[in-house]
């Protein structure tokens, strides 16, 4: 099917609005993507005519809601090519998924003297949970350093592994630099040393197909809201053998088999023992609609369109004086930059006056900011609904800011 950005844009109501009297150019999808009508309508329809508490209900609404929820689990498993839908846990998002692994698998498998490997480009969500785990148990956190071009110093990776390495936790795509890491070779190396691998896929799944079986990762996690779905819902994939061994990290309803005041509690089987309490069923329904929407467009078609747009953007930005770009030439989704000596907040504020939405700040990646010795960066992110015209507006806006501020 031929990809039509105009048809895609027509599905996103917010893209028709104005900001400061100008058409909105939304270049902040890496923070959170906008939602198509199909997602909004699916969630609204569920709340209007199909809502009920899931699991254990014998009435029609409950049974139908449960079936819809579990069908989304199946759809998500197909989306990332998991072996089974029962390898997927519904979580609030990438952050909760990583914390679940750290508190369940991590508490059971990482001991004093062990080590965990991360990289210098990680989002705080893939740093802080491991720092907390290491502090709890007396383990060491090791870091793959960056190159100036935004790639990792992969030649150092073999020196970081040893017999005490329990986990490599690595981002699929950097949320600041757009760097796509060579997961296949990194995962192979980790497994050769007996370590497990967690992949933060928050910035990858919307840009091209992901196949967790081909990657052979042990854990893969992503959020719905960056994938054109609702907030407050995400997916944690865990290889089935690992998942069945992991203890729950939250207690409550839905995750138990039996509860006795005298004999204690037993857990239900995975993945449901990791889904304590009433789930975000409306969000799950919306996520299912988002997966259906993206799959119908075709991730390969989306990838081709977005890569052409990225190449155009990088070439056009060369015309902006005093613009510093961060990251490699080959990248996915994001362009981080600074303009001269001006603070990112000032540049972002001027762009907002022109109707252009970009993200400013440290992007939850303070160690990366420290590496580049800057307090903040601007970040423009390109999604499937962005256009060449919007790129031109960004370039013109930056040129105008340079003329105004010098």
UniProtKB/Swiss-Prot annotation:
Pathway: Cofactor biosynthesis; iron-sulfur cluster biosynthesis. GO terms for biological process: cysteine metabolic process. The active site is at residue 364. Its cofactor is pyridoxal 5'-phosphate. The modification N6-(pyridoxal phosphate)lysine is found at residue 226. InterPro entries: Aminotrans_V_dom (IPR000192), Aminotrans_V_PyrdxlP_BS (IPR020578), Cys_dSase_SufS (IPR010970), PyrdxlP-dep_Trfase (IPR015424), PyrdxlP-dep_Trfase_major (IPR015421), PyrdxlP-dep_Trfase_small (IPR015422). GO terms for molecular function: cysteine desulfurase activity; pyridoxal phosphate binding; selenocysteine lyase activity. GO terms for cellular component: cytoplasm. Pfam families: Aminotran_5. CDD domains: SufS_like. Its EC number is 2.8.1.7, 4.4.1.16. Gene3D superfamilies: Aspartate Aminotransferase, domain 1, Type I PLP-dependent aspartate aminotransferase-like (Major domain). It is found in: Cytoplasm. It catalyses: (sulfur carrier)-H + L-cysteine = (sulfur carrier)-SH + L-alanine; L-selenocysteine + AH2 = hydrogenselenide + L-alanine + A + H(+). Keywords: Cytoplasm, Lyase, Pyridoxal phosphate, Transferase. Belongs to the class-V pyridoxal-phosphate-dependent aminotransferase family. Csd subfamily. Homodimer. Interacts with SufE and the SufBCD complex composed of SufB, SufC and SufD. The interaction with SufE is required to mediate the direct transfer of the sulfur atom from the S-sulfanylcysteine. Cysteine desulfurases mobilize the sulfur from L-cysteine to yield L-alanine, an essential step in sulfur metabolism for biosynthesis of a variety of sulfur-containing biomolecules. Component of the suf operon, which is activated and required under specific conditions such as oxidative stress and iron limitation. Acts as a potent selenocysteine lyase in vitro, that mobilizes selenium from L-selenocysteine. Selenocysteine lyase activity is however unsure in vivo. NCBIfam families: PRK09295.1, sufS. This is Cysteine desulfurase.
């Amino acid at each position: 099917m031929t990809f039509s950005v105009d048809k895609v844009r027509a599905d996103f109501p917010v893209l028709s609005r104005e900001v400061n009297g100008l058409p909105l150019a939304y270049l902040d999808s890496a923070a959170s993507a906008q939602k198509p009508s199909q997602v909004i309508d699916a969630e609204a329809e569920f709340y209007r005519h199909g809502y009920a508490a899931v699991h254990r209900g014998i009435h029609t609404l409950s049974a139908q809601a449960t079936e819809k929820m579990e069908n989304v689990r199946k759809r998500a498993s197909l989306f990332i090519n998991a072996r089974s839908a029962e390898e997927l846990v519904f979580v609030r998002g990438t952050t909760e998924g990583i914390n679940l692994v750290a508190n369940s698998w991590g508490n059971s498998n990482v001991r004093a003297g062990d080590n965990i490997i991360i990289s210098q480009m990680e989002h705080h969500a893939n740093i802080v949970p491991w720092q907390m785990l290491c502090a709890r148990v007396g383990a060491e956190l090791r870091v793959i350093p960056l190159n100036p071009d935004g790639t990792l110093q992969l030649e150092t990776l073999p020196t970081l592994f040893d017999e005490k390495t329990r986990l490599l936790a690595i981002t699929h795509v950097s949320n600041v630099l757009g760097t796509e890491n060579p997961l296949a070779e990194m995962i192979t190396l980790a497994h050769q040393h007996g370590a497990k691998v967690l992949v933060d896929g928050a910035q990858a799944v919307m840009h091209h197909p992901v196949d967790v079986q081909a990657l052979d990762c042990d854990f893969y996690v992503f959020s719905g809201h960056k994938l054109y779905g609702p907030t407050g819902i995400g997916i944690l994939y865990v290889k089935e053998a690992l998942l069945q061994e992991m203890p729950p990290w939250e207690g409550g309803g839905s995750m138990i088999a039996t509860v006795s005041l005298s004999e204690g509690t037993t857990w239900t089987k995975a993945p449901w023992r990791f889904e304590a309490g009433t789930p975000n069923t409306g969000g799950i329904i919306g996520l299912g609609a988002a997966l259906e929407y993206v799959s119908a467009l075709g991730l390969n078609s989306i990838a081709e369109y977005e890569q052409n747009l990225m190449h155009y953007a990088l070439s056009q930005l060369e015309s902006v004086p005093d613009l510093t770009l961060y990251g490699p030439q080959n990248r996915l989704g994001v362009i981080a930059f600074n303009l001269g000596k001006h603070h990112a907040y000032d540049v972002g504020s001027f762009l907002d006056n022109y109707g252009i939405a970009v993200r400013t700040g440290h992007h939850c990646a303070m160690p990366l900011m420290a590496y580049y010795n800057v307090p903040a960066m601007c970040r423009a992110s390109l999604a499937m609904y962005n256009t060449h015209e919007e790129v031109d507006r960004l370039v013109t806006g930056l040129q105008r800011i340079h003329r105004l501020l010098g």
